[in-house]
């Protein structure tokens, strides 16, 4: 089944145009991506290793992230992506909006609009149910360990 993405303008507003996921993006086009930082009650963050079958950054460690589908805002995309990739479903009220950035896509001329969220879990290290097409492994890490991954 095809996934469709909303295209945004330079003011980060939907244009009404759609693009099929995986189709080339035009220079200057923007689409919405979310990242979800999940912290357990011990202060550790959930990191996941991308599946080796992923087209971009296979096998790399990351926090939960994904592309918003057409007609989906950042909050809804964050809730969906976290549930799909990890099995965690703390409910929309647990998602705290951290802010928005823009970042160029890798060599495509387009631009990611990145909405960042934090989820604070009430317990330490709950069980994770990985989505094998997306996630190959997972690990809870201290803030210092996460910082080391980013270097």
Model-predicted segments: where are they?
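A short, polar/proline- and glycine-enriched secondary-structure boundary/capping micro-motif
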Residues: 26-28, 56-62, 139-140
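A generic fold-level signal
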Residues: 31, 40, 55-56, 109-112, ...
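Unchanged
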Residues: 66-151
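A glycine-rich, hydrophobic loop/mini-helix early in the fold
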Residues: 33-65
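Acidic, metal-coordinating catalytic segment for phosphate/diphosphate chemistry
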Residues: 1-35, 41
């Amino acid at each position: 089944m095809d996934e469709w993405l909303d295209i945004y303008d330079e003011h980060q507003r939907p244009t009404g145009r759609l693009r099929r996921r995986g189709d080339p993006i035009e220079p200057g086009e923007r689409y919405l991506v979310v990242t979800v930082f999940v912290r357990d009650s011990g202060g550790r963050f959930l990191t996941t290793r991308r599946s080796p079958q992923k087209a971009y950054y296979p096998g790399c460690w990351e926090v939960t992230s994904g592309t918003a589908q057409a007609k989906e805002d950042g909050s809804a995309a964050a809730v969906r992506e976290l549930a799909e990739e990890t099995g965690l479903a703390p409910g929309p009220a647990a998602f705290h909006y951290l802010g928005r950035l823009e970042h160029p896509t890798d060599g495509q001329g387009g631009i990611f609009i990145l909405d960042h969220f934090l989820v604070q879990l009430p317990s330490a290290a709950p069980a994770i149910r990985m989505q094998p097409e997306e996630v190959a492994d997972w690990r809870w890490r201290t803030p210092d360990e996460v910082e080391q991954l980013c270097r």
